A protein has these predicted regions:
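Conserved mid-core segment of classical short-chain dehydrogenase/reductases
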Residues: 82-97, 119, 139-142, 182
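Conserved glycine-rich cofactor-binding loop
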Residues: 12
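Active-site helix of classical SDR
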Residues: 110, 146
Length: 225
């Protein structure tokens, strides 16, 4: 069993569950930080539910609980987020929600984790951006703008932390192969999409000591799309 401790935000979503399982399979100690409550986590996982990561104080409290429980934190995996398709003539509610769910959660969790991550010999932050943010399509304005902001947060924070042991990177997936996406796009071949477990494997590499040479990277994980 590794001594490394990872905190996974949004750990009860489709991707979050895949990341948690990959971390457990790698022998890591895992904490799940999620807005949901009453969820069942795998054995040995520290479950911290009911956390609104758009609130900086709640984010700090959750990270403090992880450190109090395990005595350390080595990697923060910012999986929490959301998606909406909405055109710009009615975008305001979606705009605010996407920036809150995708950007503010990552910012607050990262700020809360900086002290313990700097104390780790191999501190890691991994964010989830989006390949769609590189060239937005119709109805994707709010979502891709928020993910573009995640990309820039990743690059900026990586520069700020270059003198420390902490690396900051982001994965940029295309379409994830989920039940919801299959239902929404029944005429598209899902074999070309990205399996959550495959994306989780890339995230776990970036979160590992082996990823020490990479920081500020925006890593496309696009399958065959």
């Amino acid at each position: 069993m590794s001594e490394r401790v990872v905190a996974v935000t949004g750990g009860h979503g489709v991707l979050g569950r895949a990341v948690v399982q990959a971390a457990l399979d790698a022998g890591l100690k895992v904490a799940v930080i999620d807005h949901a409550t009453g969820q069942t986590a795998p054995d040995g996982v520290l479950e911290i539910g009911g956390v609104d990561l758009t609130d900086a104080a709640q984010a700090q409290g959750a990270v403090d609980r992880v450190v109090a429980h395990f005595g350390r934190l080595d990697a923060l995996l910012n999986i929490a987020g959301g998606f909406v398709w909405q055109t710009t003539d009615d975008v305001r509610p979606a705009w605010d929600r996407m920036f809150a769910l995708n950007l503010t959660t990552a910012l607050n969790a990262s700020r809360a984790a900086l002290v313990p991550l700097k104390a780790s010999p191999d501190g890691r932050i991994v964010n989830v951006g989006s390949a769609a943010a590189l060239k937005a399509g119709m109805g994707m304005g709010a979502y891709t703008a928020s993910k573009s902001a995640v990309h820039k947060l990743t690059e900026s924070l990586a520069e700020e932390l270059k003198s420390t042991s902490v690396t900051v990177n982001a994965v940029l997936p295309s379409i994830l192969d989920t039940a919801q996406n299959r239902a929404d796009m029944p005429d598209v071949d899902p074999a070309q999409w990205v399996a959550p477990a495959d994306l989780a494997a890339v995230i776990l590499f970036l979160a590992s000591p082996a990823g020490r040479a990479m920081t500020g990277a925006l890593v496309p994980v696009t399958g065959r799309v």
